[in-house]
């Protein structure tokens, strides 16, 4: 396994966050650091030493506004990438990426993007615990279908691990699953 110094990558991601922070302040958009980014900020006073990405969450209205105006609001070389502006984009959330770089992720070999930070929309949830569980189950079902549609079915072995993605591609499209997930995620806003 190759070893490399991850710090320059982390610092470039931090540059992206600073640009996003400036845009959010200028346009009164709310965002929060979340997941491993929040853990790193609290526990390590910065990045988790081995972390190679940054995660923020935005209330849906602010997220949609940022995605709609990112091309005009973000300074070059930063750009927002989401399914709404790139139909080959395989994820149910956005990335703000550095368009002057290329980052190849093993999980998404067909999608070439730049160094990035993830932007997750924060949506409403049902009131009851049962409805919340069903909502999560439905979300994770479609997220798995999305993964099967996008991944290379022959890269991960033979048998079921290769034919399930082929079967999913027969019955689902990337666009259809993305639109279903978006409607579902926004249904409690």
What are these model-predicted stretches?
Residues 57-59:
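Short hydrophobic/aromatic beta-strand micro-patches
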């Amino acid at each position: 396994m190759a070893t490399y110094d991850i710090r320059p990558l982390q610092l470039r991601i931090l540059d992206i966050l600073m640009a996003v922070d400036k845009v959010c302040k200028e346009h009164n958009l709310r965002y929060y650091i979340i997941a491993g980014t929040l853990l790193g900020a609290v526990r390590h006073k910065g990045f988790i030493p081995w972390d190679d990405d940054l995660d923020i969450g935005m209330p849906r209205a602010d997220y949609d506004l940022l995605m709609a105006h990112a091309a005009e609001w973000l300074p070059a070389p930063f750009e927002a990438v989401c399914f709404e502006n790139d139909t080959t984009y395989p994820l149910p959330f956005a990335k703000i990426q550095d368009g002057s770089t290329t980052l190849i992720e093993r999980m998404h070999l067909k999608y070439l993007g730049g160094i990035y930070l993830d932007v997750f929309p924060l949506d409403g949830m049902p009131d009851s615990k049962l409805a919340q569980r069903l909502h999560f189950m439905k979300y994770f079902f479609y997220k798995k279908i999305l993964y099967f549609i996008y991944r290379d079915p022959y890269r991960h072995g033979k048998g079921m691990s290769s034919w399930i993605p082929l079967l999913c591609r027969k019955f689902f499209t990337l666009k259809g699953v993305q639109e279903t997930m978006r409607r579902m995620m926004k249904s409690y806003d």
